[in-house]
Amino acid sequence: NLIVSAEICEDVWSPVPPSIEAAREGAVILVNCSASDETIGKDSYREELIKGQSARLIAGYVYANAGDGESTTDVVFGGHNIIAENGTKEAKRFANEMIVSEIDIFRLLSERRKNTTFQTTEERHLPKVLFHISVEETALTRSFAQTPFVPQNMAEREKRCEEILMIQAMGMKKR
């Protein structure tokens, strides 16, 4: 039951991107074919925009930008491709190559089940196109920490432990 939705270029930059409604209607993978030109500082803004949209919608967001072969004397395209999963990102700029990453769809769906925003009984209105995709066994391209909830950085670990202790103390205080 994978639902994929597409936006085009500036859709994600708009005040109310179409991906919001698509996510509310069940899309867990959002794709954007873009031709966003390069200006000073735009790359970090673009990364934060895609990362934020992915996190806010608890979705995988695949952003494919025009590359240098499509640049002209008036505009430069850097091929800034981004794959974001619920806020995490993988991006390469001016690399003129394809990027590949995994998106944990089951994790995203699990997170959505815990979020009341996605628990709606409203009727869906967006048009749907059925498709078939073959699933192949592949090696993972990213690694996962054996202890994902324990920060490796000692300062972050101490902060996390303090936070856990305070949450538990406040819970016990209420009893």
Residue ranges, per PLM feature:
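Long hydrophobic segments that form regular secondary structure
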Residues: 7, 12-30, 157, 161-166, ...
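Active-site-adjacent "lid"/gating segments
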Residues: 72-75, 79-175
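CN hydrolase (nitrilase-like) catalytic-core segments centered on the catalytic cysteine
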Residues: 13-99
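Beta-strand-turn-beta hairpins that frame and shape the catalytic cleft
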Residues: 1-6
